[in-house]
């Protein structure tokens, strides 16, 4: 379960970086060359999704919970925004949902 969770976090980080770099280019007039590492990051994101040992729909559903938590960590660390009680509560609920889905892998 820990390996799967860490793989989900790595997957989410690749997706967020792959989307953040074009955002920098479009919204903050950063270099167009950021699109190259963005594309690589998104390709890595897709590849990482294939490493999960479950049907794609379950992987995507469980991944959503981890993505929420990773995005909130990004909000805190990169954007410098203090997380609210609602952020923490939502992240906990999303993570619990992910754990329930992953716990059922192989049992259905």
Swiss-Prot record:
The chain crosses the membrane at residues 6-26, 31-51, 61-81, 85-105. Pfam families: UPF0060. The keyword Ribosomal protein does not apply. Its main location: membrane. Disulfide bonds: none annotated. It is found in: Cell inner membrane. Keywords: Cell inner membrane, Cell membrane, Membrane, Transmembrane, Transmembrane helix. GO terms for cellular component: plasma membrane. Residues 27-30, 82-84 are cytoplasmic. This is UPF0060 membrane protein YnfA.
């Amino acid at each position: 379960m820990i390996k799967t969770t860490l793989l989900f976090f790595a997957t989410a980080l690749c997706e967020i970086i792959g989307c953040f770099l074009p955002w920098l280019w479009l919204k903050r007039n950063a270099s167009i060359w950021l699109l190259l590492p963005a594309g690589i990051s998104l390709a890595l994101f897709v590849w990482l999704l294939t490493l999960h040992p479950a049907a794609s729909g379950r992987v995507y559903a469980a991944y959503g919970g981890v993505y929420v938590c990773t995005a909130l960590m990004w909000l805190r660390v990169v954007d410098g925004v203090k997380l609210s009680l609602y952020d923490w509560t939502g992240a906990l609920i999303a993570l619990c949902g992910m754990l329930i889905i992953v716990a059922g892998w192989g049992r259905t």
